[in-house]
């Protein structure tokens, strides 16, 4: 199936201006100032006055819903495919948050699989704020290495909701994620929820200083919570 997008203001990602885009099935085959293409059955869409950008990659979405810190009625419902597409998101990484009591990694993985079936590109992290990390297989390393959609582990530090993980335990968690990533040919990252606590990223910096674990293993998020 061919689709020809005409007259869009295109960013690829640099701004190239008014252009046409020819798509065959799920592949972009040409971008040019003007494309003449009249293959029978081609769908032509006029994008005059609209911007065209690459799909957004969002590495932190609570696809099964966030919230839940003000009782069960505060739980946010899970995200739908249309919510993501309307926001221009084409790739997501699903995460658990504070609540790993009424939510779990299994339901997160199932939601990610569903999004993939619907045509999105979706991954997830095993683990949550809790420690020891909740997993599917009983092991962070096995989850990352053996489950296609799992590319790392989520943890929380320096936050009143964190599970008391020590620097030594965080080092072991990062080492497990690193090795599993190598085995499974995955990023093998530790996705860290950063709170506004006193220690900030000190433990992470110490691990980087004192061990051989690569800095790219650590992916802090919500860093604005602690700018000291």
Describe the role of every protein-language-model region:
Residues 8, 21, 26, 49, ...:
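Divalent metal-coordination and catalytic microenvironments
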Residues 1-4, 10-53:
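Histidine-rich, glycine-flanked metal-binding segment
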Residues 37, 47-110:
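Metal-associated gating/positioning segment near the N- to mid-region
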Residues 64, 98-103, 130-132, 196-202, ...:
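Active-site environment of divalent metal-dependent phosphoester hydrolases
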Residues 161, 169, 175-228:
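Active-site core of metal-dependent hydrolases
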Residues 132-189:
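Active-site gating/metal-coordination segments in enzymes
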Residues 55-59, 92-94, 122-126, 151-157, ...:
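Hydrophobic faces of well-ordered beta-strands that scaffold small-molecule active sites
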Residues 62-75, 126-132, 160-164:
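Active-site mouth loops of central-metabolism enzymes
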């Amino acid at each position: 199936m061919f689709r020809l997008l005409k007259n869009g203001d295109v960013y690829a990602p640099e701004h190239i201006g008014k252009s046409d885009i020819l798509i065959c099935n799920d592949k972009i085959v040409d971008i040019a100032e003007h494309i003449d293409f009249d293959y029978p059955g081609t769908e032509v869409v006029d994008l005059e006055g609209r911007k065209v950008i690459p799909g957004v990659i969002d590495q932190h979405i609570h696809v099964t819903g966030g919230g839940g810190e003000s009782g069960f009625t505060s739980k946010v419902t899970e995200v739908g495919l249309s919510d993501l597409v309307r926001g221009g998101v084409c790739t997501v990484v699903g995460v658990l948050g504070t609540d790993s009591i009424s939510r779990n990694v299994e339901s997160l993985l199932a939601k990610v699989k569903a999004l993939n079936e619907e045509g999105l590109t979706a991954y997830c992290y095993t683990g949550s704020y809790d420690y020891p990390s909740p997993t599917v297989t009983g092991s962070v390393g096995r989850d990352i290495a053996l489950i296609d959609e799992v590319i790392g582990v989520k943890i929380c530090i320096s936050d009143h909701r964190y599970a008391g993980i020590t620097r030594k335990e965080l080092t072991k968690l990062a080492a497990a994620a690193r090795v599993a990533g190598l085995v499974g040919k995955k990023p093998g990252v530790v996705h860290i929820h950063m709170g506004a606590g006193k220690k900030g990223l000190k433990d992470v910096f110490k691990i980087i200083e004192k061990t051989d674990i690569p800095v790219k293993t650590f992916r802090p998020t919500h860093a604005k919570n602690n700018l000291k």
